[in-house]
Design a protein with these regions (language model features):
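Secretory targeting signals
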Residues: 22-23, 30, 71-82, 87-120, ...
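Terminal transmembrane helical anchor/hairpin motif
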Residues: 2-8, 15, 76-95, 217, ...
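Aromatic- and glycine-rich beta-strand/loop motifs that create alpha-glucan
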Residues: 27-63
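Short, intrinsically disordered terminal tails adjacent to the first/last structured region
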Residues: 1-34
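Central hydrophobic cores of alpha-helical transmembrane segments
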Residues: 62-67, 213-224
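Hydrophobic/aromatic residues in alpha-helical transmembrane segments
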Residues: 112-119, 132, 167, 200, ...
Length: 313
C-alpha cells in the first residue's frame, strides 16, 4: 500500500456505547462549562434520552402500531369515498370529517398512552438500578437533568404526533381533498395533551416506581375521560351536579378537556347535533381551561424538578 493511501475509519460504536459516551460527556465538568452551560447540558441530556428511548421495544411497537393504524384508516377512508362517490360533495365532506374525527380520537388515546408508558421509568428506573448516580453526582443540576429528559421525550412525542395525527390529516387531505379547519390549533391541543401526561408521569416517577407511576397517570387519564362523559351527559340533560363533577375531574386532570376543545374545532354540524359522544363536544371547554392545562403541564414539570431535587439518592 502506498504512503499516500487514504485510511478510512468506520465507526464501530453501538448505540449503547454511544449513549454511554454521551452520559460521560454530560457528566464531565467541561460539558457544563463550555458554551451556554445549562442550555448545552439540557440539549445533551435530551439527546441521550431520545437515544435511550429509541432502544426500547415499546417505542418501536408503538411506531408499528401507528403505521398499521394509518393503513387501516386509509383503507377505510378509500372504501368510504368509493361507496359515496354518487353523493353530493357536501355530504361526502361531512363523512370525511366524521371519519377523520374518529381517527384523531383514537390517535390521541394512543399518543397519551405512549407518553405515559415510555416515560414512567425515566427517573424511577434509573434510581432503582443506580445508573442515575453516574449523572446526578456530577456537576449537573438535578432540575437540568429533569428538563433534559422531558425535552427528549417531548421531542419523541412530537414525532409521534406528526406520525399519527399528522398522518391522518394528510391522508384526509390527499385522498379525500379535505383540509381540516384550524389544523394548527387542533395539532397544538393534541400535542399539549401528550405533554401534560408526560409531565405528570415524570413527577410521579421521582417518587414512585415505574409501574406505579404509569398506573397513576393512566388512572388520572381514565378519570378525566369518565368525567368528560358525565359532564356532557349533564349538559345534555341539564343536570348541574353531573356538570360540576365533570368540571372537577377536568381540574384534577384536564386531558379530556383538551380533546373536547379540539373536537369542537373540527366537528361537523351533523355530528355536533347528535348530542353527547366521545367524538362530539356538547359542552365546549373555554379558553381559560386551555390556559389552565398549559399551567398544569408547566407546574407538573416544576414539581418533578423539585421532588427530584429533594430525593435522597
Amino acid at each position: 500500500m502506498s504512503e499516500n493511501a487514504i485510511r478510512v475509519q468506520v465507526p464501530t460504536d453501538s448505540l449503547e456505547e454511544q449513549v454511554a459516551k454521551d452520559k460521560a460527556a454530560m457528566g464531565s465538568p467541561s460539558a457544563v462549562l463550555r458554551g451556554p452551560g445549562i442550555l448545552r447540558t439540557t440539549v445533551l441530556l435530551a439527546r441521550v434520552t431520545f437515544r435511550e428511548a429509541a432502544r426500547r421495544k415499546i417505542l418501536w411497537i408503538a411506531a408499528t402500531a401507528g403505521a398499521l393504524f394509518l393503513v387501516l384508516f386509509w383503507t377505510g377512508l378509500h372504501a368510504m369515498l368509493k361507496s359515496t362517490a354518487h353523493l353530493p360533495v357536501i355530504t361526502r365532506r361531512e363523512s370525511i370529517s366524521m371519519m377523520l374525527m374518529m381517527a384523531l380520537y383514537a390517535a390521541s388515546m394512543l399518543t397519551s398512552m405512549m407518553a405515559a408508558l415510555t416515560s414512567c421509568d425515566t427517573l424511577s428506573g434509573e434510581i432503582a438500578s443506580g445508573t442515575i448516580h453516574a449523572i446526578a453526582t456530577k456537576p449537573v443540576r438535578r432540575w437540568c437533568l429533569v428538563l433534559g429528559k422531558w425535552t427528549g421525550f417531548a421531542g419523541m412525542l412530537t414525532l409521534y404526533v406528526l406520525l399519527l395525527e399528522g398522518g391522518c390529516m394528510a391522508l384526509a387531505c390527499f385522498e379525500g381533498r379535505y383540509l381540516l379547519p384550524h389544523i394548527a390549533v387542533v395539532a397544538s391541543l393534541l400535542w399539549l395533551q401528550a405533554a401534560l401526561l408526560l409531565g405528570v408521569t415524570m413527577a410521579c416517577s421521582t417518587t414512585f416506581s415505574a409501574l406505579t407511576s404509569g398506573a397513576i397517570t393512566l388512572g388520572l387519564y381514565g378519570l378525566a375521560f369518565v368525567g368528560g362523559w358525565i359532564e356532557q351527559f349533564g349538559a345534555l340533560r341539564h343536570i348541574k351536579t353531573c356538570v360540576d363533577l365533570g368540571i372537577i375531574s377536568s381540574l384534577v386532570m384536564p386531558s379530556d378537556a383538551l380533546w373536547r376543545r379540539a373536537a369542537f374545532k373540527i366537528q361537523p354540524p351533523l355530528l355536533g347535533a347528535a348530542g353527547a359522544s366521545p367524538f362530539a363536544s356538547t359542552l365546549v371547554p373555554s379558553n381559560a381551561m386551555v390556559v389552565y392545562a398549559v399551567l398544569y403541564a408547566v407546574l407538573a414539570l416544576v414539581l418533578a424538578a423539585i421532588l427530584f431535587e429533594r430525593r435522597d439518592l
